A protein has these predicted regions:
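Gly/Gly-Pro-rich "capping" loops immediately C-terminal to redox-active cysteine motifs
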Residues: 1, 40, 45, 49-79, ...
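Post-cleavage N-terminal segment of exported redox proteins
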Residues: 1-34, 73-84, 96-102, 106-158, ...
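Sequence/structural segment immediately N-terminal to covalent heme-attachment motifs in c-type
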Residues: 21-53, 149-185, 269-306, 324
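Secretory-pathway/luminal and periplasmic proteins that interact with or process carbohydrate-rich
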Residues: 38, 53, 99, 167-170, ...
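Substrate-binding/catalytic groove segments of enzymes
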Residues: 39, 81-85, 188, 227-229, ...
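Protein kinase-like catalytic domain
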Residues: 48, 78, 113, 161-162, ...
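CBM-like carbohydrate-recognition segments
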Residues: 82, 172, 366-400
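A contiguous, mid-protein "functional segment" used to position or interact
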Residues: 344-379
Length: 400
């Protein structure tokens, strides 16, 4: 943190209008906008919206609130005198924060919107990750950047990753961001981290039937998960995302299947998969963030806060998340946000079945026939494409 403070004191990218940043100010910004996932603390802005503008009644506005008021509310969560927390997330977060962190993050939000938006947000420090004594790879910290022009491209890549529809709107076709499926800006182990993926390419992929480069893998993310258009090989967007992923993987052994890659495997469901049970799980654990209709929630400024899980603004039928097992593995390890691992395997399978049993944008490989498209690309019991749910055949334009 000493490096961070000295960095901001010498740069024109001032953190506070008319002042320079000190250690606590930077830590408040990091907690507020990036979180501390080593301690399972999501960024405040992930639930309260960009800059803490608020998302509905459950996630009220933090921007401009008195620091003392914010501190008092966090303290109320800690001691149990505030109870409007259906999932227990705020109670858990409050108890994971120490007094200094509470002070700094409260100060950060109290100074908004006076605090100028950080155009940089990283220091020039150690930019290599390392393999720890347990054999696990630790990526570079979220408060460091490479120096010079390369660092600026890496920062652009991080911004694209977190705010995809804003920084890559030309190629994005929905309301999702890369970070929705790759938590902590692609750093978090067991959330398909980018550092673990980068070192495994080029590789043969069954989905494409050929050897793909990492850049081609990113292009497919835009085509399927973001329901958009693949950036060209020479685009700034693709270069920035490649550079950011390379930066995260710097120091990782190449070609090794690193611990934390992808989403953890999940035991088969003891009682099959149930749409009805999944609907109940969704109502009890997911709807508070994603809405009763699964369309996510908007911030008070009208921007997408929580992502939609189905419908026209979600991933399409060609995405990896259109496979029930992938969804179940992601949910078990990472959901509810900040409370990963709290659902049972059965609950994860059931709610994954429920989520994937809704209509979404067409698979870009659609050949004019749902039946033949399913036979060619979705012929497995873990895809709901082409199956009938509530009287409608999923993926069929005629049934919409």
């Amino acid at each position: 943190m000493q490096i961070v403070a000295s960095y901001f004191s010498t740069k024109s990218l001032t953190y506070l209008a008319g002042t320079t940043a000190h250690k606590g100010e930077v830590e408040g910004w990091l907690l507020g906008t990036r979180g501390d996932w080593k301690r399972k603390i999501p960024a405040c802005t992930q639930c309260h919206g960009d800059r803490g503008v608020g998302i509905g009644r459950r996630f009220p506005r933090l921007e401009g609130q008195q620091a003392a008021y914010i501190r008092s509310q966090i303290h109320a969560w800690r001691i149990g005198t505030r109870h409007d927390d259906p999932l227990g997330l705020m109670r858990n977060v409050a108890n994971r924060l120490d007094r200094r962190q509470i002070k700094e993050v409260s100060w950060y939000f109290s100074e908004l919107p006076k605090v100028s938006k950080m155009a940089g947000g990283g220091s020039v420090g150690s930019v290599r990750g390392f393999v720890d004594s347990r054999g696990k790879f630790i990526p570079p910290a979220n408060d460091v950047l490479p120096p010079g022009p390369f660092g600026r491209v890496v920062r652009l890549g991080e911004n694209i990753f977190i705010h995809t529809s804003s920084y890559a709107h030309r190629y994005s076709g929905n309301a999702l961001s890369c970070e929705n499926c790759h938590i902590d800006a692609g750093r978090l182990a067991n959330s398909a981290p980018m550092w673990a993926a980068y070192v495994m390419y080029p590789a043969y992929r069954r989905k494409s039937g050929q050897v793909n480069t990492f850049a081609q893998r990113l292009q497919d993310c835009f085509r399927y998960s973001l329901n958009g258009t693949a950036p060209t090989r020479r685009s700034k967007v693709l270069l920035a995302l490649e550079s950011y992923s390379y930066f995260l993987a710097n120091g990782a052994p190449t070609g090794r299947n690193l611990s934390g890659r992808g989403y953890p495997s999940l035991e088969s469901p003891l009682h099959g998969m149930s749409y009805t049970r999944g609907r109940l799980v969704f109502r009890n654990y997911c709807s508070v963030c994603h809405g009763k209709d699964g369309q996510g929630r908007l911030t008070s400024s009208g921007r997408q806060g929580f992502p939609p899980l189905w419908g026209k603004s979600s991933f399409n039928w060609g995405a990896g998340m259109a496979n029930i097992e992938v969804v179940a593995r992601f949910i078990k390890a990472n959901m509810p946000l900040g409370l990963g691992g709290t659902l049972t395997p059965q609950q994860a399978w059931d709610v994954a079945k429920f989520v994937d049993s809704h209509e979404r944008p067409q698979d870009p490989r659609f050949n004019g026939s749902v039946s033949s498209t399913r036979a060619k690309y979705h012929d497995n019991p873990l895809s709901m494409y082409g199956k009938r749910v509530n009287g409608l055949r999923l993926g069929d334009p005629l049934d919409r």
